[in-house]
């Protein structure tokens, strides 16, 4: 039986990345290389190696009591490149369209998806912050649909279930949060079902606190990812806003997951040496209100460790909190 709280790895394993041969899932290339005559073939070769290394990373995780991992959004170089999609570059449009279908790597994606499912290894995505569901610009919104749609397509080909979510932020407020929230709701409902089925909403450090997104979640039936560091940073950037205590927010947050029958996921990090919001190398303390959830609210949860030292930070927390290890 798995422990009620499991810690998750974000995209990179520092140990595997530094070894020879190196293991990681985000080999990429500059656009100019992609535009060369053999650019698509090079992109495919790097993608195949990225997919192969996902299995190696899963195996390492399992050996070290890690059963949750965020996949990189850069497994496939330039997959959602807007200019290439719109045939505004030197890339052969027919070759690029075929590249975006992912049919050329369907077997490899199906195999790694089956492997993850067989190992009960949860995989998630956190697409980039340039994705703006509430965008004013139609082009920005269409770029968002393209990128999120390709993320969803990867999971669908892999055969991943509803626990394989895509976490996004609210984005900008465009000088009027109320109007933006209305537009966010409307444009979310315009998105393809494949995207809507996997999208979850995370609070951010400046624009959208948990209490801003609870009504959106309830209206659209979207789960909420509570980020502990963003919750703290929001107080710094919005000193006049009185947020409820994090402990008091747990019931409505957990309810958003219960309604969809998806395992709740949280993000934790701590302040680093840079600007407010910068992530530290390690996480020293898991908030008590998260540790209390399995007993207090009868829910198992996953916690993504957003620390710069990646798996090293998780192993240190396993030592500090031995109950988190099977």
Where are these regions (language model features)?
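Short acidic, Gly/Ser-rich segments with clustered Asp/Glu that frequently serve as metal-coordination loops
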Residues: 208-209, 229-235
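Conserved active-site beta-strand-loop modules that form the wall/rim of enzyme catalytic pockets
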Residues: 220-226
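Short, glycine/acidic-enriched loop or turn micro-motifs at the edges of active sites
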Residues: 129, 205, 230
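Alpha/beta catalytic barrel-like cores
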Residues: 1-122, 131-145, 149-160, 164, ...
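Conserved, mostly hydrophobic/aromatic
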Residues: 126, 227, 303
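A general structural motif
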Residues: 179-184, 246
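Short, charge-patterned binding micro-sites
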Residues: 166-171
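Domain-core and long-helix interface of multi-subunit machines
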Residues: 178, 201-207
């Amino acid at each position: 039986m798995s422990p009620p709280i499991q810690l998750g790895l974000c995209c990179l394993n520092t140990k595997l990345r530094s070894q020879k041969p190196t293991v990681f899932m985000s080999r990429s290339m500059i656009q100019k290389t992609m535009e060369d005559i053999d650019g698509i073939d090079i992109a495919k070769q790097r993608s195949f190696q990225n997919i192969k290394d996902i299995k190696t990373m899963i195996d390492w995780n399992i050996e070290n009591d890690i059963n949750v991992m965020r996949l990189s959004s850069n497994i496939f170089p330039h997959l959602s490149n807007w200019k290439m999609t719109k045939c505004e570059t030197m890339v052969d449009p027919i070759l690029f369209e075929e590249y975006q279908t992912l049919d050329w790597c369907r077997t490899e994606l199906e195999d790694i998806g089956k492997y993850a499912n067989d190992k009960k290894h949860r995989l998630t995505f956190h697409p980039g912050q340039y994705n703006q569901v509430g965008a004013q610009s139609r082009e920005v919104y269409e770029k968002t649909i393209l990128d999120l749609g390709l993320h969803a397509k990867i999971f669908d080909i892999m055969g991943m279930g509803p626990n394989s979510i895509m976490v996004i932020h609210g984005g900008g407020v465009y000088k009027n949060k109320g109007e933006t929230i209305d537009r966010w709701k409307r444009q979310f409902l315009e998105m393809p079902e494949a995207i809507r089925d996997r999208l979850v909403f995370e609070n951010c450090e400046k624009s959208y606190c948990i209490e801003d997104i609870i009504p959106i979640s309830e209206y659209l039936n979207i789960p909420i990812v509570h980020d502990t560091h963003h919750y703290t940073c929001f107080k710094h950037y919005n000193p006049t806003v009185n947020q409820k205590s994090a402990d008091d927010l747990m019931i409505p947050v957990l309810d958003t997951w219960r309604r969809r029958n998806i395992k709740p996921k949280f993000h934790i990090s701590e302040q680093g040496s840079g600007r407010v919001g910068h992530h530290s190398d390690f996480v020293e303390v898991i908030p008590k209100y998260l540790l209390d959830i399995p007993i207090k609210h009868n829910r198992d949860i996953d916690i993504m460790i957003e620390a710069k030292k990646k798996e090293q930070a998780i192993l240190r927390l396993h030592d500090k909190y031995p109950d988190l290890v099977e």
